[in-house]
Amino acid sequence: MCSSDLRESGKARYIGVSNFSPEQIDEAAKYCPIVSVQPPYSLLKREIEKDVLPYCIEHDMGVLSYGSIGAGALTGKFKERPTFEDGDKRGEFYEFFNEQNWPKTKAMIDTLEEIASSHGKPTVHAAINWVLKQKGITVALVGARTPEQVIMNAQAAEWELTDEENAKIEAAYAKIFA
């Protein structure tokens, strides 16, 4: 059963795609309306700003970004480059954890930590709020390993970054990743 059949039979109301390029979205849209896209997006992974995000804005599609806290890197948990347990592939899969990129990652974390702490909030809130402040983003999907992390992540919705704070993050990003 294909996605359009699921929609027509009432088993699915809407169809979204994950990790699609604009060209792939166009191809999928030939078969059924696509209402949302789920790409990776965070301060450490911004590739969608070049094509996917503008496409979604132009076509009025929802964007449910995943990886919004950079596989945990942007939580503020890691004060130095982490070493992961056997079976945890973050160190291999995410380039921002590697030895060469860690100093840049840490500098970005420090910027988020400074802003979040000025509100008396955890660093992860600034990372989530930055994603939510970006034009075209509908939802910032975040992972959690404990019930406490779920609550902490949800509490990010209790405040927002100011335009000045967002500009400070963007300036830091431009300097760090230039």
Segments predicted by a language model, with ranges:
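Beta/alpha (TIM)-barrel catalytic core signal, keyed to glycine-rich beta->alpha loops juxtaposed to Asp/Glu
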Residues: 4-177
